[in-house]
């Protein structure tokens, strides 16, 4: 009897404990649900704007775009169809579309809608509203960027000029402080530079890149990550103008900034690779050591991160081999090409442009050594893959076929210990197009 009472009391206590622990949880969930359902639209708008900024800062642009669409709908509910806040929401949405490839037209449409709203809504008291002026600057800048992406350079330049003039007027009237104006100027100057560079006018683009960098360094700091894309674009313009020392130095500066930001191995590799490529592009022997150093850094980072059997590693390794050929280190380049063949088959497929190109280069190397049998065998494999990929009338296929025709008519000559510069010049042109998977696995020993 006593045992039965104890059991009953124990069960009753369990029920009380469960009720105490579960009921508040249910109440909390209900409260959160009710709060979400009955949350004021302006509070929902604020939270959605914060989410959009968070997604954009972490480069999750599709999620950010979803929130920006939500923001525009909530802004219309909160402020109506004619308020400048709705124009601002359209501008922000246009910026979101610009982050996604192929969406420039949508960005332009939203920027134009914002312009339409501002044109019809700006009247007292809005005419004295600093926020409206800021929105107008962002509108003209964003519309300029959208037109730039659509390669409408003249219209883009007109809108960027409007943004520049308006921001200067705001500074003179005391509506913005100088630091804020410099941040705006940095973005506008960069867009102007891109307008000129898009038209291959590197000479006109150069001073705008330099001003954009100067304003960014002042407003954000010389070691800021915001300087990196500007330094890289500036380096490209300098390279196009033949200012190779300046180009290499700017890319090295960008690389050092990247390394300070604790990048991933792949990011560090990509940054080092850009320096190496700039050093090669100069065509000057004094830059060979720089190219060697940064190629090694790039490949070491990728090897540590993912191993040697990745598309990225093999692509950079091929660039390194071409550098070795340019500097007369043909035997080392050929050895690396030969060793990489099996990995390329595994990564790109048997019948891929990468495998075809490697067979072609190995065939050229054999030909330079006087090994006509080996050259014919490798070039034949290259021709088979090229015919499958590009067809028999493609210029790459025809070039390989022509080489084989000449080779088949030539008498066998003794193998030479060193490559012939003439042969290398005749047969060393080529690139690495996109990959196509295949089936049969060629032997790397061939």
Swiss-Prot record:
Pfam families associated with the record: TPR_12
Intracellular or extracellular location(s): Cell projection, Cilium
GO cellular component, one term: cilium
Ranges for the TPR repeats: 45-78, 137-170, 186-219, 310-347, 356-389
Residue ranges, annotated region (Disordered): 410-446
UniProt keywords, alphabetically: Cell projection, Repeat, TPR repeat
Major localization class: other
GO biological process: positive regulation of smoothened signaling pathway
SUPFAM superfamilies according to UniProt: TPR-like
Gene3D superfamilies in alphabetical order: Tetratricopeptide repeat domain
UniProt entry tagged with the keyword Protein biosynthesis: no
Free-text function comment from the UniProt entry: Participates positively in the ciliary Hedgehog (Hh) signaling.
Subunit annotation: Associated with the EvC complex composed of EFCAB7, IQCE, EVC2 and EVC.
Protein name: Tetratricopeptide repeat protein 23
Organism: Bos taurus (Bovine)
Lineage: Eukaryota, Metazoa, Chordata, Craniata, Vertebrata
Gene: TTC23
């Amino acid at each position: 009897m006593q045992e039965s009472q104890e059991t009953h009391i124990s069960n009753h206590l369990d029920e009380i404990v469960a009720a105490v622990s579960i009921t508040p949880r249910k109440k909390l969930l209900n409260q959160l649900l009710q709060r979400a359902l009955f949350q004021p639209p302006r509070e929902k708008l604020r939270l959605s704007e914060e989410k959009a900024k968070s997604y954009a800062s972490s480069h999750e642009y599709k999620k950010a775009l979803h929130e920006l669409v939500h923001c525009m709908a909530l802004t219309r509910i909160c402020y109506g169809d004619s308020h400048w806040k709705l124009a601002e929401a359209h501008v922000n949405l246009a910026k979101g579309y610009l982050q996604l490839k192929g969406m420039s037209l949508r960005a332009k449409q939203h920027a134009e809608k914002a312009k339409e709203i501002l044109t019809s809504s700006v009247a007292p008291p809005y005419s004295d509203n600093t926020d409206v002026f800021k929105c107008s600057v962002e509108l003209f800048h964003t519309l300029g960027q959208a037109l730039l992406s659509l390669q409408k350079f003249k219209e883009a330049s007109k809108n960027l000029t409007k943004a520049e003039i308006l921001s200067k007027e705001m500074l003179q009237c005391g509506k913005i402080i100088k630091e804020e104006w410099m941040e705006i100027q940095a973005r506008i100057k960069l867009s102007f530079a891109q307008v000129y560079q898009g038209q291959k006018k590197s000479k006109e683009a150069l001073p705008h890149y330099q001003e954009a960098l100067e304003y960014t360094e002042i407003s954000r700091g010389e070691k800021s990550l915001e300087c990196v894309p500007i330094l890289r674009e500036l380096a490209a313009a300098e390279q196009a103008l033949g200012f190779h020392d300046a180009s290499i130095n700017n890319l090295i500066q960008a690389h050092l900034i990247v390394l300070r930001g604790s990048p991933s191995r792949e990011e560090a590799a990509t940054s080092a690779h850009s320096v190496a490529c700039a050093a090669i592009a100069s065509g000057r022997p004094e830059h060979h050591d720089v190219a060697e150093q940064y190629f090694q850094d790039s490949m070491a980072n990728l090897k540590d991160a993912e191993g040697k059997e990745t598309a990225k590693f093999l692509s950079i390794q091929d660039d390194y081999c071409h550098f070795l050929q340019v500097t007369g280190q043909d035997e080392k380049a050929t050895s690396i090409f030969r060793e990489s063949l099996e990995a390329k088959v595994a990564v790109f497929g048997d019948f891929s442009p990468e495998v075809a190109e490697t067979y072609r280069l190995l065939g050229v190397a054999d030909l330079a050594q006087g090994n006509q049998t080996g050259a014919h065998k490798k070039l034949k494999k290259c021709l088979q893959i090229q015919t499958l990929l590009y067809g028999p009338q493609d210029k790459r296929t025809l070039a390989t076929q022509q080489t084989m025709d000449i080779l088949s008519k030539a008498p066998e000559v003794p193998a030479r210990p060193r490559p012939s510069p003439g042969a290398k010049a005749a047969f060393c042109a080529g690139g690495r197009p996109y990959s196509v998977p295949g089936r049969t696995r060629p032997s790397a020993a061939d």
